[in-house]
Each structure stands twice: as C-alpha cells, then as structure tokens.
C-alpha cells in the first residue's frame, strides 16, 4: 500500500517504523529537517520537507493516488486540514491525530464532515490502558479483545507463585480456571509455550481469559486482587486529565501533582473531583506532607522519561502497590524492564499498534481481516483477533488437532455468542467466532494465514 505520514515526531516515527516492517511504500512529510534526517538514516522511506497542510507538498508526496494518509503532527488543526485536503485530492483513506478534548467530543461529526476514516488520540489511548492496568493490580499489562469479553494480561512470576516449577500441561489439568498461558519471556528469549513448558522465577507470562476467570486464576496463585482505591499522578498532562476522568468513573480517588500554576488552575476546573497539588512532585518534603507514596497506585506522567523513571522507582521502594511510568525512549524502556519496575506506558507504540491493525485490515478488506492487534515481548510476538466467516474454507468445522497450523501459531481463545472458549484439540472454529491468535509469525492479515 502507498501510505503518506504527515508529521515525523515521536508518534509519526513509531508509525513509520512499524509500517516499513510491514513492507508498505511509505512517504513521510515534516517541516523539521532533524525529524526527516532521522527517518532517512534509519528507515526505508521517502522524505519530503514541507508543511503537510500545503496542497503543493501533499501533491509532491503523491496524495492523489495514496491508499492512506496519516496526519500526526503536534497540531490538531493542521492534522484535520491535511486530512481534508488529502481526501479531496483523491486519497482513499485518512487518519488524523486529534488530542484536544473539545475536538474529541466532535469526533463523529469530524469523521462525517471531513471524511475522516479514523481519529486517533495517543493521550486518551494511554490513559485508557493505564486505567485497565490499575483495574488489574496483579498485571503489568492488560489488553482487551472481543469487545472486552476477554483480556490478555502480562505478569512477572514471584517466588510465592504456585505455578513455578510445574509444566503447563500439569497446571492446566487442575482446571482451576478457564485460562490459557499463551506467551512467555525468559531473559532475551521469547516463547510460544507448549504443555511441556515449565515457568521459572522472573519469567514474564501472558495469560488469556475472561475477567472473572483471570481473577480466579490469579487468586489461586496467591496474588492479591485488592482494588486500587486511590492514585497519585505526577504531572498535569493531557494523559493525566484523561486518566483522572477514567478513574473518577471507577470511583477511584485521584491526587495530581503539577508544578505549573496555570496548568493547576485548568486541571482544577476540568477535574472538580480530583485533588490538585501545586508543587514539585520530586520534592521529598512535598511527597511526605501530601503522603503521595501512601496511595495504592502511583503513575508518573511528566514529559521527561528520566523523572518518570526515578520517581516510579522511588514509589516502588516506598511500598506503593501499583506503579506505572510513561516512557518514550526505547533504550529507557529496556532499562526499566531490567529493573523489574513493571508497567511501562508508551503512547506512541499504542497508536502505532492501532494503525498497523487498521492497515492490515485495509490490505485484506475481502477476507477475515485483523480486528485487534497487540504487540508484546518487544514486538517479537503478536496477539491478533479475527472474526471467522463463511469464507474460511479449510478452517471452519474442523477440530483444531486436525488443522495444519503454522509453526509458532497458537489459538489462545474463541468467543462464540458471548461465551469464552479456551480451545482444546477437538474445538472447532465456526462462522461468527472471535478468534484470538498468538504468534511469532510476522504480518498475518487473514485468519487463513494460520495454516501451513
């Protein structure tokens, strides 16, 4: 597919990086030479210097015959104008990054009037992911599938976990809960486990099931299921505002610490139910006087990775039960994994995953296309959701044990008429099923791709 990305900052670069790996024809447009130099030296893309909302620049980029134009500059209005012009020039599909909460309320109208196919908001997406993780305190990541009927959670193994030292086949035979362990990370090794796999201390495991069954399994492992009732948020960013709204709906008490006076005033107006604290969130005296580390949860959301990392580690050492930090630099994210800090949030990667899913669905509009996509274990493994249709010749009505599945493909769960099925050898795929596939095979676009 011919794809134009307007804006090559952190978000645009992450999108370009993923889509070039998918072997698409990518053109990036930016008015900052430094952004283009980075893309030109590290990615297989065509770079064009200029304003992405300019007709002449879009024409030079080839918007007239583009399959998709993605506008992700730092200015909402520029993105909307770019998408409008590109669509009028002949681009088949357009996506715009829109961060302003006021525009968010008008998203449906914007899609209709401007012809947008998709509106993305990295800040809102990050806030929603943080809220999901806070609702599952034992997990370091939570990803919903099948409209929220099933979740995939990631968690680090602790010495007290009852699953340690036992094969998965032995563990699952007990049928404590209808769940499936579908992926694992051990050091630098990424594993799609079979029944002989034996979990070890410090392994990171990924498990699939309904919320109720996952809770049942975690409880059987000795994990605490106590709800996070109050959260301290460091930084008064847009993500903080969206997160505060999400947490307020769940009845969670929120404290937001922000140093900028004007931001504090805006936050106090937008978040009447939250406690807004003006001050330096890294100041030990402030932390003690406001008891910020006395909360059940701590979320570091400043614009500086270093500050987020240091404060998250301090919160962990102080005994805060659930700690999360926003990170943008890949090298920092690797460092954090080594510290065992746990939950790391990367807004740019969340959005890149969403757009990759959308692009794969466009590339396979006639078949059983990807409906959800989640990259785990550093992108080495993917979890994909498909809906089976009558086009699935060779896959439907056949017991899984008789299907010639590709090596590295695992069918983790099926949702049929609202009921979650953890598949066994005699399970079949039927039309209308939501099928969750976990694989280390890159670039699957159709459910049929699971066959060898």
What is the predicted function of each stretch?
Residues 1-452:
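Cytosolic regulatory regions of ion transport systems
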């Amino acid at each position: 597919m011919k794809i134009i990305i307007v804006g090559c900052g952190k978000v645009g670069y992450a999108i370009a990086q993923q889509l070039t790996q998918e072997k698409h024809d990518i053109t990036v447009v930016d008015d900052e030479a430094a952004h283009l130099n980075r893309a030109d030296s590290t990615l297989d893309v065509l770079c064009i210097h200029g304003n992405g909302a300019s007709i002449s620049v879009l024409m030079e980029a080839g918007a007239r015959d583009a399959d998709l134009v993605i506008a992700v500059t730092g200015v909402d209005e520029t993105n909307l104008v770019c998408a409008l012009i590109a669509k009028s020039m002949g681009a088949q599909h357009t996506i715009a990054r829109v961060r302003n909460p006021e525009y968010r309320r008008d998203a449906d109208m914007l899609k209709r009037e401007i012809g947008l196919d998709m509106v993305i908001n990295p800040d809102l997406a990050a806030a929603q992911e943080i809220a999901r993780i806070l609702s599952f305190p034992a997990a370091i990541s939570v990803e919903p599938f099948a409209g929220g009927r099933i979740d995939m959670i990631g968690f680090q193994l602790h010495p007290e976990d009852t699953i340690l030292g036992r094969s998965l086949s032995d563990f699952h035979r007990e049928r404590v809960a209808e769940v499936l362990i579908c992926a694992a990370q051990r050091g630098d090794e990424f594993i799609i486990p079979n029944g002989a796999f034996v979990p070890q201390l410090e392994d990171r495991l990924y498990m699939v099931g309904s919320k109720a069954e996952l809770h049942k399994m975690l409880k059987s492992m000795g994990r605490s299921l106590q709800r996070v009732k109050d959260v301290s948020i460091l930084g008064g960013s847009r993500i903080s505002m969206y997160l505060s709204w999400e947490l307020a709906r769940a009845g969670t008490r929120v404290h937001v610490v922000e140093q900028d006076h004007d931001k504090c005033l805006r936050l106090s107006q937008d978040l009447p139910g939250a406690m807004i604290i003006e001050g330096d969130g890294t100041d030990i005296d402030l932390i003690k006087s406001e008891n910020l580390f006395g909360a059940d949860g701590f979320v570091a959301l400043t614009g500086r990775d270093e500050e987020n990392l240091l404060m998250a580690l301090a919160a962990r050492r102080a005994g805060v039960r659930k700690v999360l930090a926003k990170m943008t630099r890949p090298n920092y994210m690797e460092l954090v994994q080594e510290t065992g800090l746990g939950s790391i949030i990367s807004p740019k990667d969340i959005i890149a995953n969403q757009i990759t899913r959308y692009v794969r669905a466009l590339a396979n509009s006639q078949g059983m296309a990807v409906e959800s996509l989640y990259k785990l274990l550093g992108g080495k493994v993917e979890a994909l959701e498909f809906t089976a249709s009558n086009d699935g010749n060779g896959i439907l009505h056949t017991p899984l044990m008789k299907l010639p599945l590709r090596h590295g493909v695992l069918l983790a769960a099926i949702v049929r008429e609202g009921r979650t099925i953890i598949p066994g050898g005699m399970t079949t795929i039927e039309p209308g099923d939501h099928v969750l596939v976990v694989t280390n095979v890159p670039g699957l676009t159709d459910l049929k791709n699971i066959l060898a």
